[in-house]
C-alpha cells in the first residue's frame, strides 16, 4: 500500500519545492523504496505546451508524449524513473475533464460544484495507479493562499481523512529571510504561512525551512512552538553550491528520517548514497574547465533551457570538467560578426526554439562552427538551422529556408503533415490547433552504421523524445549529402531525418530530438558526454 507525502510551499514562490520533492524521492529510493513523484499545477492552461518559455520556462516532454511542468525533469533526473502523462495535472485539465463528463451526462443532472466534483477529480488523480509504489510524493504548485490552489489544498486535506490512518504526511516548505538591519533570521513569515495552511485544515507534520545561513537552535524551537510541529521536524534547507548537493544535505539534516518516522517506519533501512557522493565529488573537484556558448532565443529566462543546462553539466560530470556557459542571444549575430563572441569558446550549442526571430543568428553560429572546426551541437531547431546553412553555403541553394518563417521556393525545412506513431498514421494541417499537435514523445530512429553518432550510442537503434512540428525536407537529402553533410539517422520508415553530421569535422552533430530530456547526473546522456569530451579536446587547442 502506498504512503503519500504532500509538499506545499509558503511565503514566496520559486523556493524549490520541485527540488525538495525530487531530493526526498532520491533519498527514499536510496533506502530501497519504490517512489513515484507527481505534480499538481493550479494554472488554468490544459498543459504548458502553448505557454511562453520566457514566462513558464521549459516544457518537459515525457516518453508518452505529455507536455508537462519542468519539475518533472527534476523528478526524472534525481530518481531515474521516467515520468508519464499521469504524473502531472493542471486546473485546466481538471475542469476540461469535468465539463466533458457534464456534457456526457455522467453526473446524472447534479449541480456540478467545486466541492465535491472538482476535489473528487483531483483526489482520483492523486490515488490512481499507485499500487506498485511504496511512496507517492505530490508537489502542489504555487503558494499557500493562491486562489487558484484552493481546490487542490481542499483535496489533499480531504485525502488526509480518506486514506488509511498514518499513510499521509504533509511537508511545508517556507522561507526564513535574513534581515541585515536586525542582524537576524525572521520566523514570522513562516508562522503566518503555517497559520494560513492550518486555516485550510492542513496541519504540517514537517517544516522544511529555506535559509541562506545556519538557523539558530532557539529559532527552531520557536518555529516548533508556534507552528505546532515537533522540534526534530523543523528541518533547515540551507543554500548549496549545486542542486546535486541537495539529497545529501537534506539527509544530513534528517529530512528522510523525519518523513519515515512520521509514517511510523522505525528503524528504517540505511540509505546507499555512494553514487550521489561520487557525483558531488566530481563537481567539487574538476580536472579542467570548458566554455560552451549557448546561442538561443530565450536566454532572458534560463529556466527555458533547464534540462539542457543540467545535461551539459552531466557531460561535465562524465568528463570530470567544469562546464561554464556563455549565453548569447541569437539576434546579436544578425547584426554583428559572431567571431568575437565565439573565438574563445570550446563548443557551440544551438538549442530548440520556435519562429523566425533570431533564426539567421543561429545559422551564422552553425557556419562559424563548421568553418572554424569548433564542436557544434544542434538540437531540434538547431539541427534545422545547420541544414539550412549547409544548403545555402555548400549546396548553393541560395533561397534555402523554412516554411515556418513564411512561403519559400526552397523549403529545406517544412511542416510535417504525416508521420507514424506506433501503428497509427498521425496527420496535421497548418490550420490545426497549436496545443498538443506536435510530434511529441519517444520515437525510434535508425542510425547509419559507422557514423560518429552510432559510435557514440554504441548502437544503430535508438529511441529519443521529440517536440516539433517542422522537419528537414528529405527531398534535399541527396543534394546535401553530395556536399559532405551526412544524414546519419532517419525514422525507421526512412521518411524523417533524425540526425546529421560532418565526417570531416571534429564534432558536428545535429539531432531533431531532445536528448537533454533523458540525461541524468548518475547516467549522463552519451551525446552530452561526447560533446563535452570534444569541447575538452578543443580547449587544449584554443
UniProtKB/Swiss-Prot annotation:
Binding-site residues for UTP, renumbered to this chain: 13, 186-191, 222
Keywords assigned by UniProt, alphabetized: ATP-binding, Glutamine amidotransferase, Ligase, Magnesium, Metal-binding, Nucleotide-binding, Pyrimidine biosynthesis
Positions of the catalytic residues: 380, 514, 516
Gene Ontology CC annotations of this record: cytosol
Binding positions (Mg(2+)): 71, 139
One Pfam family recorded for the sequence: CTP_synth_N
Gene Ontology process terms (BP): 'de novo' CTP biosynthetic process; pyrimidine nucleobase biosynthetic process
InterPro entries, per database record: Class_I_gatase-like (IPR029062), CTP_synthase (IPR004468), CTP_synthase_N (IPR017456), GATASE (IPR017926), GATase1_CTP_Synthase (IPR033828), P-loop_NTPase (IPR027417)
EC id: 6.3.4.2
Sequence positions that bind L-glutamine: 353, 381-384, 404, 469
Further facts: CTPSs have evolved a hybrid strategy for distinguishing between UTP and CTP. The overlapping regions of the product feedback inhibitory and substrate sites recognize a common feature in both compounds, the triphosphate moiety. To differentiate isosteric substrate and product pyrimidine rings, an additional pocket far from the expected kinase/ligase catalytic site, specifically recognizes the cytosine and ribose portions of the product inhibitor.
Record-given protein name: CTP synthase
Organism in which the protein naturally occurs: Rhizobium leguminosarum bv. trifolii (strain WSM2304)
Higher taxonomy: Bacteria, Pseudomonadati, Pseudomonadota, Alphaproteobacteria, Hyphomicrobiales
Gene name per UniProt: pyrG
Amino acid at each position: 500500500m502506498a504512503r503519500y507525502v504532500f509538499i506545499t510551499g509558503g511565503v514566496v514562490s520559486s523556493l524549490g519545492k520541485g527540488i525538495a520533492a525530487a531530493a526526498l524521492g532520491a533519498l527514499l529510493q536510496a533506502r530501497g523504496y519504490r517512489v513515484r513523484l507527481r505534480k499538481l499545477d493550479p494554472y488554468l492552461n490544459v498543459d504548458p505546451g502553448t505557454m511562453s518559455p520566457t514566462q513558464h520556462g521549459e516544457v518537459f516532454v515525457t516518453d508518452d508524449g505529455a507536455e508537462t511542468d519542468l519539475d518533472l525533469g527534476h523528478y526524472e533526473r534525481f530518481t531515474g524513473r521516467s515520468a508519464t502523462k499521469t504524473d502531472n495535472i493542471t486546473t485546466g485539465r481538471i475542469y476540461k475533464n469535468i465539463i466533458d463528463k457534464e456534457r456526457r451526462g455522467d453526473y446524472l443532472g447534479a449541480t456540478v460544484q467545486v466541492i465535491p466534483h472538482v476535489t473528487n477529480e483531483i483526489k482520483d488523480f492523486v490515488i490512481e495507479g499507485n499500487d506498485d509504489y511504496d511512496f507517492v510524493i505530490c508537489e502542489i504548485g504555487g503558494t499557500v493562499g493562491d486562489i487558484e490552489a484552493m481546490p487542490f489544498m481542499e483535496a489533499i486535506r480531504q485525502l488526509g481523512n480518506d486514506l488509511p490512518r498514518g499513510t499521509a504526511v504533509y511537508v511545508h516548505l517556507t522561507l526564513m529571510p535574513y534581515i541585515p538591519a536586525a542582524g537576524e533570521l525572521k520566523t514570522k513569515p513562516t508562522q503566518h504561512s503555517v497559520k494560513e495552511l492550518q486555516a485550510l485544515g492542513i496541519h504540517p507534520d514537517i517544516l522544511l525551512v529555506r535559509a541562506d545561513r545556519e538557523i539558530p537552535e532557539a529559532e527552531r524551537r520557536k518555529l516548533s512552538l508556534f507552528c505546532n510541529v515537533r522540534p526534530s521536524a523543523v528541518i533547515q534547507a540551507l543554500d548549496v553550491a549545486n542542486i546535486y548537493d541537495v539529497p545529501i544535505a537534506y539527509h544530513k539534516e534528517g529530512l528522510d528520517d523525519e518523513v519515515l518516522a512520521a509514517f511510523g517506519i522505525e528503524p528504517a533501512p540505511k540509505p546507499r548514497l555512494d553514487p550521489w557522493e561520487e557525483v558531488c565529488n566530481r563537481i567539487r573537484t574538476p580536472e579542467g574547465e570548458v566554455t560552451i556558448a549557448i546561442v538561443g532565443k530565450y536566454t532572458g529566462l534560463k529556466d527555458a533551457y533547464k534540462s539542457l543546462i543540467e545535461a551539459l553539466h552531466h557531460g561535465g560530470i562524465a568528463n570530470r570538467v567544469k562546464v561554464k556557459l556563455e549565453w548569447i542571444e541569437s539576434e546579436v549575430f544578425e547584426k554583428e560578426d559572431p567571431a568575437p563572441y565565439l573565438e574563445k569558446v570550446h563548443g557551440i550549442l544551438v538549442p530548440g526554439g520556435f519562429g523566425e526571430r533570431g533564426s539567421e543568428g543561429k545559422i551564422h553560429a552553425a557556419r562559424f562552427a563548421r568553418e572554424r572546426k569548433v564542436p557544434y551541437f544542434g538540437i531540434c531547431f538547431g539541427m534545422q538551422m545547420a541544414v539550412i546553412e549547409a544548403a545555402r553555403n555548400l549546396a548553393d541553394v541560395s533561397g534555402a529556408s523554412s516554411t515556418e518563417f513564411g512561403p519559400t521556393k526552397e523549403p529545406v525545412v517544412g511542416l510535417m503533415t504525416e508521420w507514424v506513431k506506433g501503428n497509427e498514421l498521425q496527420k496535421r494541417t497548418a490550420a490545426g490547433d497549436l496545443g498538443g499537435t506536435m510530434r511529441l514523445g519517444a520515437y525510434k530512429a535508425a542510425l547509419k552504421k559507422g557514423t560518429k553518432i552510432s559510435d557514440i550510442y554504441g548502437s544503430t537503434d535508438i529511441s529519443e523524445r521529440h517536440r516539433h512540428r517542422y522537419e528537414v525536407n528529405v527531398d534535399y537529402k541527396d543534394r546535401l549529402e553530395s556536399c559532405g553533410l551526412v544524414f546519419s539517422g532517419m525514422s525507421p520508415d526512412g521518411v524523417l531525418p533524425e540526425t546529421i553530421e560532418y565526417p570531416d569535422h571534429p564534432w558536428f552533430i545535429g539531432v531533431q530530438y531532445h536528448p537533454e530530456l533523458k540525461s541524468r547526473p548518475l547516467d549522463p546522456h552519451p551525446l552530452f558526454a561526447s560533446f563535452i569530451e570534444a569541447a575538452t579536446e578543443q580547449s587544449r587547442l584554443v
